[in-house]
From Swiss-Prot:
Name of this protein: Glycogen synthase
Organism the protein comes from: Pasteurella multocida (strain Pm70)
Entry EC number(s): 2.4.1.21
CDD domains in alphabetical order: GT5_Glycogen_synthase_DULL1-like
GO process annotations (BP): glycogen biosynthetic process
Amino acid sequence: MKVLHACSELYPLLKTGGLADVMGALPFAQKEIGIDARIVLPAYPAIKAGIPETTVVSEFDNFAGHIVLRYGEYKGLGVYLIDAPHLYQREGNPYHDQWYNDYADNYKRFALLGWVAAELATGLDSWWHADVVHAHDWHAGLASAYLFNKGRPAKSVFTIHNLAYQGQFAYHHLVEIGLPAGMFHVDGLELHGQISYLKAGLYYSDAVTAVSPTYAKEITTPEFGYGLQGLLTTLNSQGKLVGILNGVDDQIWHPNHDAYIEHHYKLKAMTGKRKNKEALQAYFNLPQDPDALLFVMVTRLTEQKGVDLLIDSAEEIVKQGGQLTILGSGSPHLEAGILHLAQQYPHQIAVKIGYDEALSHLMIAGGDVILVPSRFEPCGLTQLYGLKYGTLPLVRATGGLADTVVNATVENIKSRLATGFVFEQANREALRQALVNAFALWQKQRLWFTVRSVAMEQDFSWQISATGYHALYQRLLSFN
């Protein structure tokens, strides 16, 4: 079975969000279970630098100009690079310039990604033809539209990592990307009078996946559907919409061999966790108190992530003698809000604006509780890291957070099911009460260690996800 993943990021070469982490792990896990998986993505500077040895597969001109398709390998995984310097030779973020303006030619840059993915199912590489083209997020959404326009020579799967980003462009660009005007209608590419690359992926694919079962349900509702809930409800009723959880890359995220932390540990030997807590407190110049309940948050600073809820309820942590460290960047008013907290309570709250991979690992290894109070969260990865590292997740019951964390109620603790703290409503009081519950459990260390042990025993490996996708591909291929 030959599967081509079409995407715009690949960890660790280029990352702006969780999509890169998925692409840096899922294809490798699929190879381990016998799938011939490859990736196609634009040859951004960081990608070319990370895969310097390539051969030319094809050279051609199309609607996007002169294109060279190259093939190389990254850690043994086959990767096609779409080499078009006039489109992709731009340093930094792959989607926008340094002033956060989307590139004006994004419609063409990402149409080309979808077009090449479809062509790789029909002979663009004479040595390898994809049986399944698996596109990820709006950037690759047109792949299934091009396949549809070619008579569906391969099966197509589209994964929604975040429905909020829809890739919408003016109608007049349709003639510039090689698709017929007849595809621009409500049963097709059209959304609110524009071309939607995300809707193309939803409408024309043979199957659509969301990155957790709960998120797959949520996006069929007006609250989470972003105007597409009608289409998604139809797909769900047709059996075309499924939720498959993301996994954790054990090679990168495991407390017993994490390359970024000095003190390793595992379930039966937890001394290293205490030492990481000391190191984290020292890094942020907080009192090195082993008895202080240490909360950590590694996130984009946005309302989606519930950062405003934390700002409004952080005094509960202060009042109960806890500590809070935050790493992230985002909305200026939220950055200002958490910096104000740190100035107000310098011995209990510390903040670093920006992103630091090594520090993120230390925070997840050294913290006692990881905060993920998101308003919505398609899957979420940090709570999975928290489980693996024995840093109990405190989450809102949404998306993948609801699928992966079990609330520490008395009954769940007795049944050895509890793995963290869960609150329902996206408001200050609900989060504050969850913080109170965390402090209450912290006072009962024997029970805390029980919950922590159950958390660390959870298995959210990529092998499970890869097996789920394999079953989906097999089902589609059996429909020939």
